[in-house]
Swiss-Prot record:
PANTHER family: C-TYPE LECTIN DOMAIN FAMILY 2 MEMBER D-RELATED, C-TYPE LECTIN DOMAIN-CONTAINING PROTEIN 180. This is C-type lectin domain family 2 member D11. The gene is Clec2d11. The chain crosses the membrane at residues 45-65. It comes from Rattus norvegicus (Rat). Receptor for KLRB1B that protects target cells against natural killer cell-mediated lysis. The keyword Phosphoprotein applies. Its main location: membrane. Gene3D superfamilies: Mannose-Binding Protein A, subunit A. It is a single-pass type II membrane protein.
Length: 207
């Protein structure tokens, strides 16, 4: 009996040791499954990191495109020569002295221009407003009262504003356009196309 009783604690101790070893083994397996070092877990983590990285890059690109100003190129005309005034694509000159129509046209020719020509209502309004109280020769003439009015380049005058009088040379006054003889002394206005254009880059943000 004593031998049996003595052997029982030893058996219990051995069983406990075996149970402890098995517990450690299962615990280690569980840790390996849960541990981030397992291949499945690592692949999952890498996948999440890649998705987040792509999302961050895409968001950064979208924000940079939205906030970066876009450049729009607009054609504008360069400054006119000194003492000339720019309107649209033309430059206009207003004399401070009076002379006849022929001399006035010769002066404008020397400036690589012609006696003033208007092609739009804006240009006509500008000429009428800027001339003040003085009369100014413009580039309209005709062979006789029976012939149509023409510009200095011989293109026909087609504007709706009529020209008063029966003379051959036109000038701008307070009531519109009138005609006078060639030797009458009046101030004059020259005009020329401004062929020099600049590209002006203006930034704007997309909506």
């Amino acid at each position: 009996m004593s031998a049996k009783k003595a052997s029982q604690p030893m058996l219990n101790t051995t069983g406990s040791l075996q149970e402890g070893e098995m517990g450690k083994m299962f615990h280690g397996k569980c840790l390996r499954i849960v541990s981030p070092e397992s291949p499945a877990k690592l692949y999952c983590c890498y996948g999440v990191i890649m998705v987040l990285s792509v999302a961050v890059v895409a968001l950064s690109v979208a924000l940079s495109v939205k906030m970066t100003p876009q450049i729009s190129t607009i054609n504008t005309y360069a400054a006119c020569p000194r003492n000339w005034i720019g309107v649209g694509n033309k430059c206009f000159y207003f004399s401070e002295y009076a002379s006849n129509w022929t001399f006035s046209q010769t002066f404008c020719k020397a400036q690589e221009a012609e006696l003033a020509r208007f092609d739009t209502e804006e240009e006509l309004n500008f000429l009428s407003r800027y001339k003040g109280s003085f009369d100014y020769w413009i580039g309209l003439h005709r062979e006789s009262s029976e012939h149509p009015w023409k510009w200095t380049d011989n293109t026909q005058y087609n504007y709706s504003l009529s020209i008063r009088g029966v003379e051959r040379y036109a000038y701008l006054n307070d009531i519109g356009i009138s005609s006078a003889r060639v030797y009458a002394d009046k101030r004059w206005s020259c005009s020329k196309l401004n062929s020099y254009s600049l590209q002006c880059k203006t930034p704007f943000s997309p909506m």
